């Protein structure tokens, strides 16, 4: 049956079929991802981008073609992730430009629009490289243009252009040595061909649900050869944001970004631009880009950690949020994956421990006119993390702040419901925070290293939570009062009486006072005695000491607890900035894990 035109309804179905085909193949795309960085997330990034489009177009299946293509372009820009996702976003921007005059199109009109889309894709990159998705896009579009001159049938034209795209894909190893050495084709190019195959299948069958299993054509040996080390990257942070402004000059924007990193991709319009870059200083990047407009939807991934996940032999991933306080070397050693909390000073937005350091945070806390606010990681951040990990691990345990204190647990749970690991997945309420969550996470991480089975790990988590307590002493009550958790009247009374509150987490997960010490002198010596008295003669396995830029008392406490409990494992860590919002400068916490 001849298909003579493409309208909004058909375009909706075509997109759905094509996107579903790629979603089915995202794990494979992650495995063959070696360029520009072997961080194993091309499939995840393309899938995340396309899922965002699908969610946005669901209510709009009966719009005219030009109206629907505008919605697709906007959704692609908002949801683009990674180098490949931002290139796709600019492709859909260009396609929308080409389809703007039409409620429906012929093969030749669609081919003309595809050329604009491909041209726009090239403009997104400062240094376009052949042997990538760009080569596949160009071959597909050129073939569409040629075939549409001789046939008005979309089915016939699509078949010819798919063959051209596949040929270009198979040639990518000849264009990029890194692909040839790894024995793979370009991952993003393969993703685009997968979309085309899904569309072709839909045209042939008329049924979106009948998607064939795609033969990748590569052996397991080839997949193993993609495990390239990325520990020594000059620009290790894959960094993205959206800039909203009045008249964003893309040429000037790209020149501004050029000294700050590589793999620069810019998509969007004069009023809304999505930028992608690999950099060594995300905070400096966001601050620099603010001259062009409001910087929104900040995202930063450490590609070194992603690469370690690709190479990891572990079968179970452990995820925490950034309120879990552990020293960086412990997080790295045990491959603990961190989803950062967000915080802001007025309109200035930051990613906890990524785009703001502890020193920077406490400096702003002292001098900013705005008291900072925190917000839990959005479900999209968790979803992207889980999607990536599901390609490299069989199971996941995600450990988070108490449900009664934050929406972090709920957001993680909502995201995990949309991602399926091969074997097991669960969200655990730590019923603790900071160093308390840290000692629980460390217990689980060490058990994962020893190949403990998933059911036993869940039981171990429950047992460790039951045996963990955290005590927190505040140097001042200023931050807790400014954050709205203590009234001005109560603060004045406590200060007048010379009381020092000691806080802990109840068995239900609430943060409440559990005692006081008296007198403003030697606060932390008194706190030390308070905690030792609480511990009494109990056997302690692990101690986590955390502080808000107050290292000297923290170090003294480390010596005290190592002496009092010589068999215990003791670590010292900073309070994360997100907790510093409420605890303030100088706060000290002591987490105890009992045997």
Regions found by a protein language model. Give the residues of each.
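N-terminal glycine-rich anion-binding loop in soluble enzyme alpha/beta folds
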Residues: 319-377, 381
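Glycine-rich oxoanion-binding loops at beta->alpha junctions
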Residues: 45-72, 355-390
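Short Gly/Thr/Asp-enriched flexible loops that form oxyanion-binding sites at enzyme active sites
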Residues: 82, 89-93, 398-420, 439-442
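Acidic, glycine-enriched active-site microenvironments
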Residues: 9-12, 16, 20, 24-25, ...
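A generic structural motif
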Residues: 271-280
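Generic N-terminal targeting/processing segments that precede catalytic cores or assembly contacts
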Residues: 1-59, 256-260, 265-266, 279-285, ...
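Mixed-charge interfacial surface used for oligomerization/domain docking
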Residues: 119-123, 135-152, 156-272, 306, ...
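Charge-rich, low-aromatic oligomerization/scaffolding segments with amphipathic character
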Residues: 281-298
């Amino acid at each position: 049956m001849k298909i003579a035109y493409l309208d909004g309804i058909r375009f909706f179905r075509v997109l759905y079929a094509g996107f579903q085909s790629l979603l089915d193949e995202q794990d494979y795309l992650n495995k063959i991802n070696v360029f520009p960085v072997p961080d194993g997330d091309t499939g995840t990034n393309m899938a995340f981008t396309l899922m965002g489009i699908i969610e946005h177009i669901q209510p709009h299946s009966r719009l005219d073609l030009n109206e629907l293509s505008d919605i697709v372009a906007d959704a692609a820009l908002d949801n683009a992730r990674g180098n490949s996702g931002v290139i796709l976003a600019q492709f859909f921007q260009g396609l929308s430009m080409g389809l703007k005059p039409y409620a429906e199109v012929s093969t030749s009109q669609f081919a003309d629009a595809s050329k604009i889309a491909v041209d726009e894709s090239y403009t997104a990159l400062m240094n376009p490289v052949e042997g990538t998705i760009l080569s596949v896009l160009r071959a597909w579009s050129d073939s569409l243009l040629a075939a549409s001159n001789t046939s008005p049938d979309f089915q016939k034209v699509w078949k010819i252009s798919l063959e051209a795209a596949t040929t270009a894909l198979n040639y990518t190893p000849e264009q990029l040595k890194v692909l040839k050495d790894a024995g793979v084709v370009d991952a993003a190019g393969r993703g685009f061909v997968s979309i085309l195959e899904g569309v072709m299948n839909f045209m042939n069958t008329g049924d979106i649900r009948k998607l064939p299993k795609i033969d990748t054509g590569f052996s397991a040996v080839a997949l193993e050869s993609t495990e390239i080390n990325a520990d020594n990257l000059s620009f290790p942070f894959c960094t993205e944001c959206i800039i909203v402004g009045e008249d964003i000059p893309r040429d000037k924007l790209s020149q501004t970004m050029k000294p700050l990193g590589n793999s620069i991709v810019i998509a969007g319009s004069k009023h809304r631009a999505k930028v992608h870059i690999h950099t060594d200083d995300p905070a400096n990047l966001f601050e620099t880009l603010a001259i062009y407009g409001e910087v929104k939807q900040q995202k930063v991934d450490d590609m070194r950690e992603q690469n370690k996940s690709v190479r990891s032999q572990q079968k179970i991933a452990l995820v925490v949020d950034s309120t879990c306080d552990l020293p960086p070397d412990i997080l790295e050693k045990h491959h603990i994956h961190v989803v950062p909390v967000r915080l802001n000073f007025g309109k200035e937005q930051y990613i906890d421990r990524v785009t703001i350091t502890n020193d920077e945070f406490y400096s702003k806390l002292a001098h900013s006119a705005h008291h900072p606010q925190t917000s839990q990681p959005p479900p999209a951040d968790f979803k992207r993390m889980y999607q990536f990990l599901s390609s490299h691990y069989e199971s996941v345990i995600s450990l988070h702040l108490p449900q009664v204190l934050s929406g972090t647990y709920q957001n993680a749970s909502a995201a995990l419901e949309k991602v399926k690991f091969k074997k097991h997945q669960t969200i655990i309420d730590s019923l603790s925070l900071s160093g308390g969550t840290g000692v629980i996470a460390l217990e689980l991480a060490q058990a994962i290293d020893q190949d403990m089975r998933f059911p036993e790990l869940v039981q171990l988590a429950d047992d460790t939570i039951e045996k963990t307590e955290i005590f927190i002493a505040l140097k001042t009550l200023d931050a807790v009062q400014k954050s709205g958790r203590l009234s001005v009247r109560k603060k004045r009374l406590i200060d007048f009486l010379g009381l020092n509150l000691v806080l802990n987490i109840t068995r239900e997960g609430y943060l409440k006072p559990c005692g006081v010490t008296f007198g403003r002198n030697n606060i932390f010596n008194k706190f030390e005695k308070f905690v030792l008295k609480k511990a009494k003669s109990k056997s302690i396995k692990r101690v986590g000491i955390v502080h808000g830029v107050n290292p000297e008392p923290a170090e003294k406490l480390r010596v005290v607890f190592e002496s009092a409990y010589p068999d215990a494992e003791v670590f010292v860590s900073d309070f994360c900035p997100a907790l510093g919002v409420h605890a303030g400068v100088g706060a000290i916490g002591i987490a105890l894990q009992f045997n």
